[in-house]
């Protein structure tokens, strides 16, 4: 079985051919009787998922859900406080260290970092929610220029730590949880974590 965060297919398909890498990959799995499970949004939203792991990695305390799901206690993004306020430069260095990134992109709104909103993957659409939650800084990925401009001039520091960089911390946690569940269920199975290559990186 292959467990992934991102699905290979996002849009519905009517047939599968070998004309695209996505279809070829899934056909290879089918031919070799390999099941594929892609968690994606459910893992983003659930308590203990992508955003909780990201918030914990950064060191946020007293975290709350940034964008609550309808009818549930979970949802997208988290917002919490640092143990001690710091400058954006200091916080940026912290982000690079804990997420193991060589580079990040930051927009400086001139505020010290104390209350931080995070959304793993692509969460730039939630700038208004971050501001409404009282955050002074927002960490996410896939930030466009005009989105960053809106954040900075609205008084919100913004950090693009890349889509991949903000989600990768979840992988080892997920593998450990699956291994524990298998062991407690009496299954003799090995959980292997694939070496992740960075799709986009500074050269």
Predicted regions and their residues:
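Active-site catalytic microenvironments in core metabolic enzymes, especially phosphate/sugar-handling
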Residues: 1-203
């Amino acid at each position: 079985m292959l467990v992934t965060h991102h699905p290979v297919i996002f849009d519905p398909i009517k047939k599968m051919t070998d004309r695209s890498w996505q279809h070829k990959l899934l056909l290879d799995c089918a031919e070799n009787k390999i099941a594929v499970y892609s968690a994606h949004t459910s893992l983003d939203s659930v308590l203990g998922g992508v955003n909780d792991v990201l918030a914990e990695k950064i060191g946020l305390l007293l975290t709350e859900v940034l964008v609550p799901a309808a009818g549930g206690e979970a949802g997208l993004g988290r917002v919490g406080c640092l143990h001690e306020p710091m400058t954006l430069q200091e916080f940026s260095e912290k982000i690079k260290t804990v997420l193991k990134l060589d580079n990040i992109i930051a927009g400086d709104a001139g505020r010290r970092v104390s209350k931080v909103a995070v959304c793993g993957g692509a969460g730039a659409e939630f700038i208004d929610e971050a501001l409404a939650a009282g955050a002074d800084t927002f960490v996410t990925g896939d930030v466009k220029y005009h989105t960053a401009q809106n954040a900075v001039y609205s008084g919100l520091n913004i950090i693009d730590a890349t889509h991949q960089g903000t989600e990768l911390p979840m992988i080892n946690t997920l593998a450990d949880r699956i291994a524990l569940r298998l062991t407690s269920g009496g299954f003799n199975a090995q959980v292997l974590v694939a070496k992740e290559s960075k799709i986009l990186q500074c050269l």
